[in-house]
Amino acid sequence: MTEILTTSNSAEDLLDMDGRVSEQRLAQLRIRQQQERVTKELRDVIQIHQCKKGIFCLVKQAKISYEITATDHRLSYELGPQRQKFTCMVGINPIVITQQSGDTKGCIHCSCDSIECTYTLLKTLCGLRDLLPMN
């Protein structure tokens, strides 16, 4: 006799299976689904972001993550090393200036009640170089 085992991910089946462990699994599943939804929304907002800086905007250059905690929202960003090269003429001699900066990491916190502040946080990141000039 062959038994057919079926698996179901409905909330009722998870709770009936083994009580407290099922509740923990269900809570983890909800958290994971919420984080996946937030990640997808973040990707969408980054895709549609446009400003006059174009590809030089921090929103387009940075590796961005978004976290929702019980007390606040946090947009974390990370920029890799950046290199600038500038050439100018002094008389007839060219002068080349090369400048390199290391990794830049940071985060922007928001303690509002709305979970829909992703766009505002991205606009803040977009204007960050105007607020805090970096080399």
From Swiss-Prot:
Belongs to the adenoviridae E3_15 family. Transmembrane segments: none annotated. GO terms for biological process: symbiont-mediated perturbation of host defense response; symbiont-mediated suppression of host apoptosis. The lineage of its organism: Viruses, Varidnaviria, Bamfordvirae, Preplasmiviricota, Tectiliviricetes. It comes from the Viruses. The keyword Cell inner membrane does not apply. This is Early E3 15.3 kDa protein. Pfam families: Adeno_E3_15_3. InterPro entries: Adeno_E3-15. Keywords: Early protein, Host-virus interaction, Inhibition of host caspases by virus, Modulation of host cell apoptosis by virus. Protects virus-infected cells from TNF-induced cytolysis. It comes from Human adenovirus B serotype 7 (HAdV-7).
